[in-house]
């Protein structure tokens, strides 16, 4: 280094603003006494079906609302509205493969969470992008379906390490797939 040149380290996470927004949203929801759950998985793993069954078991005790995130359809929001008593809204991402804290905040505002005990965000079906963005949820849950294979925690470790819980779905077809329930879970800190 010379007197004419100086190096200034300005490294900052590209996620810093989103992380701050997510923490603010988390605190706001906590003050409202609304629990936000972020449900993530690959497309077709059974997120919506699992939500329908879960909501139908919980809705007599909890006020529940659901935000469905998809690139362009409203199929899942319609399914939730038709098969449960939960309020359902659709969030179109316009090609984005995830939701961030600001997008989630827009959904929370539209869902009007002040009267809800539980708000559920069904994130875009993808094992990569949704794991990279903090949505402001109090809990992240991932679904892994048997047909996807038991190697997904090794192939997509971030998804499985940021989640607070994992659901193994479609276990009724386990005999037809090469899926070892005891395989590789410890790699990502998952206790089966």
Stretches found by the model and what they are:
Residues 1-14, 177-192:
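C-terminal lobe/tail of nucleotide-utilizing enzymes
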Residues 4-27, 32-37, 45, 49, ...:
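Nucleotide-state-sensitive switch-loop elements of NTP-binding domains
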Residues 41, 125, 148, 157, ...:
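Catalytic acidic motif of RecA-like/P-loop NTPases
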Residues 42-43, 67, 93, 145-146, ...:
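G-domain G4 guanine-recognition motif of GTPases
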Residues 65, 139-143, 160-174, 184-192:
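Conserved beta-strand/loop subsegment of P-loop NTPase cores
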Residues 78, 157, 186:
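Active-site phosphate/pyrophosphate- and oxyanion-stabilizing loops and adjacent acidic/basic residues
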Residues 124, 142-145:
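Active-site segment flanking the S-adenosylmethionine/decSAM binding pocket
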Residues 153-155:
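Short beta-alpha junctions and helix-cap segments that line functional grooves
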